[in-house]
């Protein structure tokens, strides 16, 4: 049961169209989830959001979009790994403790989604300027909203 030469071009065309549709659809879904996570994170005011993080977004002029996403995921992972059990972040009350756990959960989700969007195995992160986690997340949200508007076109 071989394919005739007349069937091959339409099959390749359908395959290419399906791939482009799936890529655009996945881009749309992933970005929407990232933006929703960033909205939740930036609304939270916890003790940890005032701590500093390596601001790779300030020094991302000569990097590709994928490298920027990869580096953002890397610094977020470094941040939440270091501060997950940090007593400065845990707070004194049960409510502060709950907010901190929620913050870490959202940062892990954001990390996972950024890695998926980047599609890279690893990326180097050079020491750059520092900013608060709150400012970093706001800038990342702006970048993601711009990408989302381009993805929808």
Curated annotation (Swiss-Prot):
Disulphide connectivity of cysteines: 27-151, 48-89, 70-123
Region forming the signal peptide: 1-24
Classification via SUPFAM superfamilies: 4-helical cytokines
Domain of life per record: Eukaryota
Entry's localization field: Secreted
TM stretches of this protein: none
One GO MF term: growth factor activity
InterPro entries linked: 4_helix_cytokine-like_core, IL-4, IL-4/IL-13, IL-4/IL-13_CS
Annotated keywords: B-cell activation, Cytokine, Disulfide bond, Glycoprotein, Growth factor, Secreted, Signal
Coiled-coil positions: none
GO biological process, one term: interleukin-4-mediated signaling pathway
Sugar-bearing residue positions: 62
GO CC, alphabetical: extracellular space
Pfam families: IL4
Function text: Participates in at least several B-cell activation processes as well as of other cell types. It is a costimulator of DNA-synthesis. It induces the expression of class II MHC molecules on resting B-cells. It enhances both secretion and cell surface expression of IgE and IgG1. It also regulates the expression of the low affinity Fc receptor for IgE (CD23) on both lymphocytes and monocytes. Positively regulates IL31RA expression in macrophages. Stimulates autophagy in dendritic cells by interfering with mTORC1 signaling and through the induction of RUFY4.
Record family assignment: Belongs to the IL-4/IL-13 family.
Annotated protein name in UniProt: Interleukin-4
Annotated source species: Papio anubis
